[in-house]
């Protein structure tokens, strides 16, 4: 079975690499060009493309729209202690879209990467 891949469009590939490797335990699997990198965490490969890059992911659609960062679709990273993890990230100056919310399935918060792409940090309920 092929690995899971998700593509994010970003403003700055190097800033994105630093963010994901320093704060979320991703590793750099490949960085073959300034406008593209593959980051890995477990079974997830995160493909990051510069919004103005030369590759196909940055090309305009037939109607003229161009890919851009942001939106609401996101990856989810499960953590054991959401409150403690969020506190560490806040001290590092990272941006969150909201505060921790608790629902039937657990606790979550939305963290923005440097380009404004969301990452859901999630803590399941205690068993």
Language-model features and meaning:
Residues 16, 20-23, 89, 116:
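Conserved active-site tyrosine of GNAT-family acetyltransferases
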């Amino acid at each position: 079975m092929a690995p899971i891949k998700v593509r994010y469009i970003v403003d700055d590939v190097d800033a994105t690499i630093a963010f994901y490797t320093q704060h979320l335990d991703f590793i750099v699997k490949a960085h073959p060009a300034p406008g593209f990198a593959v980051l890995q965490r477990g079974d997830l490969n995160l493909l990051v493309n510069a919004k103005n890059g030369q590759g196909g992911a940055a090309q305009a659609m037939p109607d003229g729209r161009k890919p851009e960062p942001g939106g609401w679709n996101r990856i989810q990273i499960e953590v054991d202690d959401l409150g403690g993890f969020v506190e560490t990230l806040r001290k590092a100056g990272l941006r969150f879209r909201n505060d921790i919310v608790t629902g039937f399935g657990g606790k979550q918060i939305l963290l923005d990467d440097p380009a404004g792409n969301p990452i859901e940090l999630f803590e399941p309920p205690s068993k």
